[in-house]
């Protein structure tokens, strides 16, 4: 065991010399072992090295630095007998901190102190096991001590495990904002948008900040039952958070009232505590919604613009906007189905429906990959294998007519994944308005594999949504 105290000027050089000598001896031994064999044969004993490093950390042999970690607000102190060389290899901050002292007191928050042993283990072995609740404190430690590889690793873990539960997504979003991690912030925001119904029904909904709420309310890709569900979720948030009146009124004005049927609007005006308190702030929007429902969209568009966000549906799961489709054994063969949606959200079109036909093909081959004949004898070039194809989904109207004048249809397909008994949205694919299919639909999915992330009990869970998009009429001179 080395003595505690300031490191000697030659200690780093001696340590590196020892490592270099070990490397030369190991290399010579490997050459001797493979003396008569072909060049390039490798012997990999890296797992033995990892085991030695674990033993070194656990036993504290030849340690030259003691880290004492105290949890803030407690008297609890944990001591770690470590080696400045190994700590300094990963962290420039540790290299500076330990350059002239052999014992350091570190003060960390309670959650960071609780995982400090995992953090130190990573510096020795380059690996650790992470739980959801440990992600933020580990990322904080990696950021504080400038361990870039662990920062990236934990951030990747958080993005990959957002579907592990709606609770972490809210906390992780706020953490990403505080640290400036834009990639993690956007991943959390996307997960929350796609699974808003689950988020709004959880205890974490009250922890949503006004800034996050504003970000969500302005999005058109929110997945929820209907706009009325969003209003009730907002009203519940207002009751818990009790924000200033300006924040509450701004949030209430983000609701898309034309997407709510008139009968439900009447009930909201009569029973909603939020509208009773802030009704004057949204009176113009309610009047706009009633006017929209009272006239045909074509007539309304002659006097008002209908291409604003208030007239654009979100991703509603209600039957009027689409239908679920569960495809068992999706890799087996082609499937087809049909469903109906309402012509538009206007009350004037409440009884008018459009029928849509859907075709799913698990192994569709583009023309460029299909077998062709190249010579006069009719000899075929090698045919493309079935696995060379990609999944394809085509959505077409059963008939066309004048009912859709002034409106186009935006199609969206949601792909669900089950986690801990819940079905969450894992992916969403949007079609171009002029297209009948999404070009990248399940482009990287392996439907042959039963444990594919896209499958739930060997079934593909889709939800097909068709959103009418209104266009402002172009007036022509008479």
Swiss-Prot record:
Pinpoint the BACK domain residues. 169-269
GO CC: one term? extracellular region
Q: Which PROSITE patterns match?
A: BTB
Gene3D superfamilies, A to Z: 1.25.40.420, Potassium Channel Kv1.1, Chain A
Record carries keyword GTP-binding: no
- CDD domains annotated for this entry? BACK_BTBD17
Q: Which SUPFAM superfamilies match?
A: POZ domain
Q: What is its main location?
A: secreted
Q: Matching Pfam families, A to Z?
A: BACK (PF07707), BTB (PF00651), TRAF_BTBD17 (PF23651)
- Record keywords: Glycoprotein, Secreted, Signal
- Subcellular location, in the record's words? Secreted
Is the keyword Disulfide bond assigned to this protein? no
**Source organism, top-level taxon:** Eukaryota
Q: Sorted alphabetically, which InterPro entries does this protein's record hold?
A: BACK, BTB-POZ/Galectin-3-binding, BTB/POZ_dom, SKP1/BTB/POZ_sf, TRAF_BTBD17
Kindly indicate where the leader peptide sits in this chain: 1-28
Q: Which residues form the BTB domain?
A: 63-132
Positions of glycan attachment:
61, 100, 195, 307
Looking up PANTHER family in the UniProt record yields:
BTB_POZ DOMAIN-CONTAINING PROTEIN 17 (PTHR24410:SF12), HL07962P-RELATED (PTHR24410)
Could you identify this protein by its name? Answer: BTB/POZ domain-containing protein 17
Q: What species was this sequence derived from?
A: Mus musculus (Mouse)
Taxonomic lineage: Eukaryota, Metazoa, Chordata, Craniata, Vertebrata
